[in-house]
Amino acid sequence: MKITKIEKKKRLYLIELDNDDSLYVTEDTIVRFMLSKDKVLDNDQLEDMKHFAQLSYGKNLALYFLSFQQRSNKQVADYLRKHEIEEHIIADIITQLQEEQWIDDTKLADTYIRQNQLNGDKGPQVLKQKLLQKGIASHDIDPILSQTDFSQLAQKVSQKLFDKYQEKLPPKALKDKITQALLTKGFSYDLAKHSLNHLNFDQDNQEIEDLLDKELDKQYRKLSRKYDGYTLKQKLYQALYRKGYNSDDINCKLRNYL
């Protein structure tokens, strides 16, 4: 087969053959196989060229994908599949990228966890879930998590939540709110409870009463549209109790309110 045409198309070259076949190749392919117009290729040479062309093209795609941020082996492989790179070529590309240290799942997991320690708010359970979603194996994640101290991060997150809600909730409800938020963010129950020890939940009676008055007004506006009489009183009591207010304080307020 003879090459009848070589035409540059943006980042690729169009190769046309005298058997009406055509293919796109990278500049690396042109150089490696010393391609030029009128060059004759046998079947083996053509197959070698096609394999190298897809390998070169796929690797360039992968490097472009990696130029934005670190990626896992799986993320790179999935990206190449979207661009219709063949599976055996993908395997070769992944191997090359690993050997050249462009991709490293263990390093990616370590960087991800360290960045979270600096400016994130996730606990180990959520971090592991997110890394697994990236296709990183547990054996690359677990050793790093086990060596990472999350106590200071839990304290920082709990302090931020405390500052946000301390003027809106009574002590019991505030503790429950912070604990639940930490659990949702992936911290263990023990770590969540321990982080509360560094916070001051003391509120004087007037502060608690003011919060109760405000919440009672809010719940009354909401519930009085649907209920009245004894049923309204019961609904108000239940709503306030769920918010963490003391039963005696609630009953006292309701007697004077209704």
Curated annotation (Swiss-Prot):
Major localization class: cytoplasm
One matching Pfam family: RecX_HTH3
GO CC annotations, alphabetized: cytoplasm
Location within or outside the cell: Cytoplasm
GO BP of this protein: regulation of DNA repair
UniProt entry keywords in alphabetical sequence: Cytoplasm
Tree of life domain: Bacteria
Gene3D superfamilies the record matches: Winged helix-like DNA-binding domain superfamily/Winged helix DNA-binding domain
UniProt similarity note: Belongs to the RecX family.
Function: Modulates RecA activity.
Annotated protein name in UniProt: Regulatory protein RecX
Native source organism of the sequence: Streptococcus pyogenes serotype M28 (strain MGAS6180)
